[in-house]
């Protein structure tokens, strides 16, 4: 009986520990996955950091004003596995890229990167594209 209780207790503890980890790794916790959009602009910066790279771009609005967008993405290790490195992004800084993404639930100029098309026409679509 004692071993059975210990096993149940361990299972309950693991469930409580795993839930926040799963939520952290789910873009749908922060981003509205049902609201995809496409945006073109100048790639200004890429933070090649763990746990997720962050892509910054300036996009001109119809009135000529510039919006400074920030897109979160997969970790650097994911990009290396698909043969795309920091240098590939560095070459595109200052050039026009097209991003397909979803907006943050909190609003603002913040999104999750689903696809990026580089100036040479090559594009990369993230494999992990959850549904709402």
Predicted regions and their residues:
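Short nucleic-acid-contacting surface segments enriched for D/E, G, S/T with interspersed K/R
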Residues: 81-99
């Amino acid at each position: 009986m004692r071993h059975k209780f210990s096993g149940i207790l361990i299972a309950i503890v693991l469930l409580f520990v795993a839930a926040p980890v799963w939520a952290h790794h789910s873009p749908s916790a922060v981003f509205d996955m049902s609201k995809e959009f496409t945006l073109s602009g100048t790639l200004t910066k890429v933070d090649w950091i763990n746990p997720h790279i962050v892509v910054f771009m300036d996009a001109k609005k119809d009135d000529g004003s510039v919006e400074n967008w920030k897109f979160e993405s997969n970790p650097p290790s994911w990009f290396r596995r698909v043969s795309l490195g920091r240098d590939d992004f560095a070459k595109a800084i200052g050039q026009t890229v097209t991003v397909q993404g979803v907006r943050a639930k909190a609003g603002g100029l913040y999104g999750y990167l689903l696809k990026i098309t580089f100036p040479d026409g090559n594009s990369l679509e993230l494999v992990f594209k959850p549904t709402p």
